[in-house]
Amino acid sequence: LSGMDENAASLARKWGLGLELTDFCEARKLEEPAAMEAARARCSGIGSLWLHAPFAELSPCAIDPRVREVVMLRFRQTVQAALALGIRRIVVHSGYIPLVYFPEWFTARSVEFWREFLRDAPDGLCLALENVMEPEPDMLVQIAAGVDDPRFGLCLDVGHANTRVSETPPLDWIAPMAPWLRHVHLHNNDGDWDLHDALGQGMIPMPDILAALAEQCPAADYTIENQNCELSLRWLCARGYLEEP
């Protein structure tokens, strides 16, 4: 369950599920001791954990080398924070912005960035690169193939794949990403804005998505990304995916 729901931690404990920590989505909190203590308390008693890295203004493909230095610093701080909390799985946004970065630049510079980043990263780390504003999965697939490191994979955000910036239906993202897919963000929308609606509220054919993921990416795990995750938990229970606690 995503920490974007303020009740996610208590729901995770109640339902026996994991938590994707969002406490450090704002990069400044990486340097605030109080934020670390709050995150530690939130994680208490939860066995399966992911950490969502900060993302605003952090593009690994940044054109300005000084900006790239800041991105490298913030993601290294993210790894340090995760390890301090006993977390080894981290979701990172790709940083792609349409009409700002040419796809060729974005993929080449991203591969370069992540190879450099992973030189100093510990064994056993898992980074999952998430789609946000990409029109199709090919750029992320090229990055994962180019980085070619067992610590580096992909995160399919099903909701982002159904917004106005995506030119590819969500179902068609799965097969290309499958060899590298480590994690999935689940939420629904109306095909336009990134609403993060409950799984049953929107036009994404969620049963078809879940069936395709189970068949093609059985090792991937999932985060429900809603501001009210309980609605999606009830939807999953009603269809036999989960049992109520």
PLM segments and residue spans:
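Alpha-helix-loop-beta-strand connector modules within alpha/beta enzyme cores
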Residues: 39-56, 110-124, 206-213
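Charged helix-capping and loop-helix junction motifs
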Residues: 33-38, 67-76, 104-114, 166-175, ...
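Active-site acidic/histidine proton-transfer and metal-coordination neighborhood
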Residues: 61-153
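Helix C-cap/helix->beta junction micro-motif
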Residues: 15, 44-47, 85, 121-123, ...
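Acidic-and-aromatic substrate-binding clefts and catalytic sites of carbohydrate-active enzymes
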Residues: 1-9, 22-37, 59-62, 98-102, ...
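Hydrophobic faces of well-ordered beta-strands that scaffold small-molecule active sites
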Residues: 1, 17-21, 49-53, 90-92, ...
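N-terminal pre-domain/capping segments
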Residues: 1-77, 243-245
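Histidine-acidic metal/acid-base catalytic patches
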Residues: 7-13, 88, 137-152, 156, ...
